[in-house]
């Protein structure tokens, strides 16, 4: 099978694509891949590092206001379609999959126009502009949230989940806890604000640190590398309780996620896919700075099923943070109920499900 993949701009579009590629390689070692992204996007460094052949096109997103930039964007799109057709003819894929971001617009559109089987994968509960546009032309739309289904043609939608979920399974949680200094018998909560950290969450954590010192559970706090020195400076003034561990970054996040009892985090699509696959209860603090407020809508999908609590950033204080953690961690029944609810939402074999959809299209 020859697979052309496109997606970029943010890790949320790139990492699911890489997880899918790794799964396909396991199931079909003969498979060949080409990834098309942009020269300036994260994908231009992440994808080649993963050993996957990479080509780039020039593309930009539409501005919401009428402007000359949008004329340039249309011109770039048309040029991107031509460049994509050239790469497609040269690589001769059996199937093309787009995982979101502006770049997959011209790539997947070009493939559909050339009569090649096409899929888009939508990670969020509210679809991005590119995937909504492409849904008119592709054969299938793979989604991760029930809330996303209504935005696409019903006959094309398949619920597959996020391939990243498959990568957190079969991790050693005890090893994960040990690696960061958490003790095995005690309950623990992991608090983090995404790969780069989040200042409002840092502020609430620092404010709460003295009260955390009185708790029976342990707290692992990940600041994000850019915030670490500032947080540690503030912590030094207040004192660092023995049950609170602070790290700038965690390189073995799937292992650590497996080991902890509760997670406090943003509500990015990849994070939620991992948490539900593992059956982890969570307190979700959606980022209000994302397009279409999609993190709050992602969070709502999990909260409504009883697998998480939602704490809006505007309501985030030391008191509300501790309150929500205590209500889950200190109540065994609540913790257990939320674990079961999360597990029921999870799709741990998401990468395999997506590969099955691809196989069916190729064999049509």
Swiss-Prot record:
The keyword Secreted does not apply. CDD domains: GT28_MurG. The keyword Transferase applies. UDP-N-acetyl-alpha-D-glucosamine binds at residues 10-12, 124, 195, 250, 295. It is a peripheral membrane protein. GO terms for biological process: carbohydrate metabolic process; cell division; cell wall organization; lipid glycosylation; peptidoglycan biosynthetic process; regulation of cell shape. It is found in: Cell membrane. Its EC number is 2.4.1.227. GO terms for cellular component: plasma membrane. Pathway: Cell wall biogenesis; peptidoglycan biosynthesis. SUPFAM superfamilies: UDP-Glycosyltransferase/glycogen phosphorylase. Cell wall formation. Catalyzes the transfer of a GlcNAc subunit on undecaprenyl-pyrophosphoryl-MurNAc-pentapeptide (lipid intermediate I) to form undecaprenyl-pyrophosphoryl-MurNAc-(pentapeptide)GlcNAc (lipid intermediate II). This is UDP-N-acetylglucosamine--N-acetylmuramyl-(pentapeptide) pyrophosphoryl-undecaprenol N-acetylglucosamine transferase 1. It comes from Bacillus cereus (strain ATCC 14579 / DSM 31 / CCUG 7414 / JCM 2152 / NBRC 15305 / NCIMB 9373 / NCTC 2599 / NRRL B-3711).
